[in-house]
Every structure is written in structure tokens, then in C-alpha cells.
Amino acid sequence: MISVVVGMQFGDEGKGKITDYLCSNYDDVVRFNGGNNAGHTVVIDGKKIKFHLIPSGAMQAGTVVLGNGMVIDPLKLLDEIKQLKLAKDNIKIVISGRAGVVTELHRILDKKEEELRSNSSIGTTSQGIGPAYEDKYGRLSIKMYDLNSIKKIKDKLNQLIAMKGLLTGPVDIDRVSNELYSAGSELYEYIGDASEFLEDEYRLGKNILFEGAQGAMLDIDFGTYPFVTSSNTVAGSVSTGSGFSFRRVEDVIGVFKAYTTKVGSGIFPTEIGSDDLRIAGNEYGTTTGRPRRTGWLDLPILRYAAYLNDVNRLAITKLDILGKLNQIKVGTSYIIDGKDYERFPDKIDPESEITVNYETFETWGDISSRISGYLGSGYDALPYNMRKYIEFIEDSLNCSIDIISLGEDRKSTIVK
């Protein structure tokens, strides 16, 4: 089976938990976009493990693959590999030599660019991801393959300084070069042709799971530009981000929260002007710790994401959190400047007048003390109001919700 897990909102949907749950059935798990701006948390028997570069499925899959579509901070990757080795024996990692390298210069540039944007700040994670992708498309990148040569590292850093030095200020090139070279010497055993590895695995009949980072609404082309990430996040970017043919993908799983959250600026039609959901769901970014904006489930966004990713099944997370509210709403459509929209439109002018049409549902209450009973009995034992909510979403999206998450832990999951 060749599967892709993608986020259908603004990231933070719970892809990490779903991927970790699924990965016992897969031989390889692959990251194909983003960098350490993607934070995901896996909870196993109450123990939290947080990754930013290593895919969430690493705890169960045989081989971890980091594709060419990523930009990688070698020092932070080393830290995560050490963390992974403490949690798991016999790890196997393949890192594409074509992946770009995130350096200290990129982090400095990221912060400086945000300062220069002033009131139009995007709200980046300040991890250097955007500037690293800028260099990729400007053909200036240090590649993972380059980390075995101190000369190549220095030459490319000097080139970056020559072109962008006014923004970075003084940087100790020797120190940065030596840090990258040292990290590279430890990582080089893992660096190779990830595309060829995946081709070989496919021909051997291995099961491969591609794990997307961020979400559809943060895609550089299809998201709420300019308040987006710097890479393509939709399922189709599996091919360009890993070198694996998308025609071989059999299964696209769209993951979404039972409500909507967003970090940073930009349009958010169903946003709620209270802290109730944030507090109930502990909605703070894994990478930055920033409070997430919260709102009701947005069906126009989910319809748009389902179409973009061609999802064939869905996974819903945090239903246990949503039930703690006294009343629950779902945004079913928009009226924008007098025109009706059931799907998120190609463009929304920031000055437009937006009205959201809502469907209201009765709560199913706080189920925290009853979750273990539901897990043992299956979908039909879930509260009636919760099942009504799930089935309304299925009917609205014309797609089955096969995976239902009722908590952070891997075990707190029901498969229909």
C-alpha cells in the first residue's frame, strides 16, 4: 500500500498522531516538504515525544526517509536522531542529498524579514525556512551532499553573504562552516539518493507512507497567500518532494481537527472571539509555543482541501475536546460581497464583507472518563450527538471518516 497523509486546514491537525497510529502497517515513512517549522507530537503510553524534522511515523516504521523537497537544519536533525535512538532500537534513516540546508544565516534573515514586513508580518516560526527556500529557487542552496566539503560550505556561505549581507549583518563564516561540516560528518552515513531508495522499496512490494507537513491552507500556491508556508503541502507535492511517482499512490488520508486552528496572521472566517477552545484543547504551537487562533469547523475549507488533495478517506481529531463546549457550530458556507460560496474561493479580498452560515449541534459533553469504554466497543458506542456530528461532515464532504481520534495517545483511536 502506498499512502499519503495530509493536513486539510492550517496545520496542527493532528497528522503526527494519525501517522504514528497507521505506521505499524508500513515499512517506510517519508517526509517530502518543509523543515523544522513543522512540529508534531506523538504520545505513547503517556510519554510525549516531539519531532520537527523526523516524521512522526518514525517510532513504528522500519525506515525514515527525508526527501529532497525538505530544507534541513543539520544541527537540529542530529539532536532529533539522538532523541529517536533513545526511544527506539535499530533505526534506519535515508536523507536525500538534494535537500537544502538551513543555516544560521537563514534564521537571521527570517527574523529580519519579519521585522521589515512590520504590520504585514506573516507570523513565521523564525526557523529560517522561508529564506532557505528562497535560496533553493535562487540556486544558491547548500545541499546535504555538500556537507562533506568544508570548501563547498564556505564558498556557498560567502556567496550568500555577498548577496544578502546587508540583511544578515556580520556572521562568523568560519564558525558556521565548521559547525555544518561537523554535523555533516555525523550525518553523512545517512545521506544518499532517497528517490532511488524509494523506487527499490516499491519494486520489492514494500508499504510506504508519505507524511505531509503543515496543511492545505498553508500551501505556497493554494493557501491563503501570503500567509502561507514556503513549500507545497498538498498531496501532489509527494512527487516533486521525494522523486516518487504520484501515479503509484493508492490512498490519500485527509486529517482535520473537529474545529479549526491557525497560527499567525491571515484570513480565518470561522474564528471565535474567545479563549474557550484554546484552553480546552491546549492550543499552543509545538514549534513556537505561540497561542493558536481558534474557530469552528469550516466546511468550505474542507471541501477545498478534499478537492486539492483528492482524498479518499478522512481522519478527525480532538472530538474529545470539542465536546467540552456547551454548544457546537459548523461553518457550512460563506456569503462574500453578496455571493454564496460552498467551497473556499480562489481569492478573498481582505476588504471583503464575509458572512458565515452555520449549522448548530448539541454537545456530547466531556467524555474524558468514558474514552476507554468507547475504544473497547467501537464507533456505534460513541455518543449519539458525536456520531450525528461525524455523519453530517461525511455527508457534506461526500467522504468517509474512517479514523476517529479521542485523545493524544496512540491507543485513543477508533477505526470504523
UniProtKB/Swiss-Prot annotation:
One of its GO terms (molecular function) is adenylosuccinate synthase activity. It catalyses: IMP + L-aspartate + GTP = N(6)-(1,2-dicarboxyethyl)-AMP + GDP + phosphate + 2 H(+). NCBIfam families: PRK01117.1 (NF002223), purA (TIGR00184). Pfam families: Adenylsucc_synt. It is found in: Cytoplasm. The keyword Ligase applies. It comes from the Archaea. Disulfide bonds: none annotated. GO terms for biological process: 'de novo' AMP biosynthetic process; IMP metabolic process. Binds 1 Mg(2+) ion per subunit. Mg(2+) binds at D12, G39. CDD domains: AdSS. This is Adenylosuccinate synthetase. HAMAP family: Adenylosucc_synth. SMART domains: Adenylsucc_synt. IMP binds at D12, E13, G14, K15, N37, A38, G39, H40, T125, R139, Q214, T229, R290. Pathway: Purine metabolism; AMP biosynthesis via de novo pathway; AMP from IMP: step 1/2. Plays an important role in the de novo pathway of purine nucleotide biosynthesis. Catalyzes the first committed step in the biosynthesis of AMP from IMP. It comes from Picrophilus torridus (strain ATCC 700027 / DSM 9790 / JCM 10055 / NBRC 100828 / KAW 2/3). Its main location: cytoplasm. One of its GO terms (cellular component) is cytoplasm. The keyword Electron transport does not apply. Belongs to the adenylosuccinate synthetase family. The active site is at D12, H40. Its cofactor is Mg(2+). Substrate binds at T286, T287, T288, G289, R290, P291, R292. It is an enzyme of class 6 (ligase).
